[in-house]
Each structure stands twice: as C-alpha cells, then as structure tokens.
Amino acid sequence: IELVLIGVLARGHILLEGLPGLGKTELVKGLSRALDITARRVQFTPDLLPGDITGTPVLQERDGTKNFIFQEGPVFANIMLADEINRASPKTQSALLEAMQERRVTVMGETHALPSPFFVLATQNPIELEGTFPLPEAQLDRFLFKINVNRTPADVLTRIVLNREMGVEPEISPVLNAQELLELMQMARNVAIPEVVADYIGRLVNATHPGESEASGGVKYGASPRAALGLAAAAKARALRHGRAFCSFEDVQAVIHPVLEHRILLNHTARLDGQTPAAVINRLVREIPAQNKPLPDSLAAAKIH
C-alpha cells in the first residue's frame, strides 16, 4: 500500500501483477474512495477496441444538422482502473500510450485533455496464464512502478474472514479531495534532491546497460532516461511520505526495485540460467557505491536542486 501511495504522489502510473483473487482491484477501488476522486474501471478483454477506452465520435442530429460529437471514454477520469490489462490485444493496450505520457488523447485529429490529476492503475495476471498478451515495451516503460502482489499470509486471511463478507463493499471514508491531492503532488515535486543523490541515480541507471557493470552481464536492454526521472520522482515522494524536505540514498534504494525491474530485459541465456531482473538490481545496489565523491560540508556545496 505504501508503494502505491508513493507512486500516486510521484504522479506515476502503477502496474500491479499477481494471481486472480489477491485483492488488486479492491486496492485500487479503495484508493479512489479514500482520495474522493473520480474512477472508471475497464475490464480488458480480447475483443476490447481502442475506442472503448479513449472514446468515439458519435453522429448526432441537432436542428436539422448532423455533426460528430465526441463521447468521452472511461479514460476521462482521475483514476482509470485497467483491470487485467494483458488480456487485451496489443493494439488496444497501445491506445493508452498517449494518455499515459501526455495526459491527453487524440481522436480523429482532435486533442482532448484529461482531468487532473490523472493516473492509470492497471492490474495484470502473470504471463504464464492462458489468454494473456505481454505488454509492449513502450507501454511498460510508462509505468512508474510494477508491483508484484504476493499471496496473503495466514494471519491476514484470518482478519479478512472476520471483517469482510463476500459481495459486500467495505465502507471507506474520504481523507483527501482532488485539490488536496494535487497540492501534495506539488509538494513531492518540490522535495530537494542533492547532487550526490542525482549522481547515484544516474550511475545506477547507466549500470543497467550491457557492458557498464558486472551485474548487467546477462542484460539485453537496460533502463531508459525515463527510468532515471521516475527513480528521482519516486525517491522524492518517499522522502515526503517520511516527512523530509530532501531525498537520500535510502529513498532511492527503497524504490529501485518497482521502478527498474520491468525496465530491464534479460537476454536468452540469462533467462535460461534462471536470472531475474530483481537479482540484477540486487547486484547493482551492492556493486555501485552510493557515494562517488566526498560528501559536501555545507548546504551550498551540496548543490541541492
């Protein structure tokens, strides 16, 4: 839950992966109620069309004149819940690309701005399940976080059984509204990032590429500059979450896995050997020193941005 909150404060899109029934959809629905913002849910299926997400022009007659009127799709909400996103075809998945990056959609040459704040919270099943389509790399890169949802421990299951009833929605009272959420997002953007921390982020992301570190020996493609920006934004949001006005090496290390795991593509040999992006990142954190230069002895020397 903390990672989801950090992702929202960082204005990022979040992908939740796990087996059916683990509460991924409930988490997203509960978040929308707690933040008191609009949410629209789309169940992704193989026959879903791009227009079912972005909206379509509808021919209407008014005063004897026929005109196309744009009918907004479910993407026009503060939160769009893309449920089981990898069950739709790649063409339909790609309909979200412009919305996720530019926070707008273009239909028949006309551009329509999306509400603010806007972010996509998507759920997907592991690709080993039948009827799933891997997300395109370009779309994966637009998700700030990919969070693996694991099975629920026995003690948590006990509390669920005692406090929940199947088919009954839990009562969740709003704790924020849209304007207050926007103000918190701006506060996260204003969190300072010292130059030594920015340097650490740059060296970490660069080290994900083949030939740049020992840890990246089995990597085919490393993380993009967008990943570096996302890592900085997530570190800032975590610092705000913990009541600090500047981010630290610890913040970077706390969010590096959900930011980078889905952006590292291993080569065929590494996959056959059982390597995982998570293992590569663990090795990177051990291999790349946090401090590449002496720590500053004053605030002015820290070059805080």
Residue ranges of each PLM-predicted region?
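Walker A/P-loop
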Residues: 5-46
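Conserved beta-strand position immediately N-terminal to the Walker
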Residues: 14, 80, 118
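Walker B catalytic acidic pair
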Residues: 18, 83-84, 95
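P-loop (Walker A) phosphate-binding loop of NTP-binding proteins
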Residues: 19, 53, 123
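Canonical AAA+ ATPase core
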Residues: 60-65, 88-92, 100-191, 236-241
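AAA+ P-loop NTPase domains with strong preference for DNA replication initiators
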Residues: 155, 162-247, 272
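C-terminal engagement/docking regions of AAA+ P-loop ATPases
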Residues: 210-305
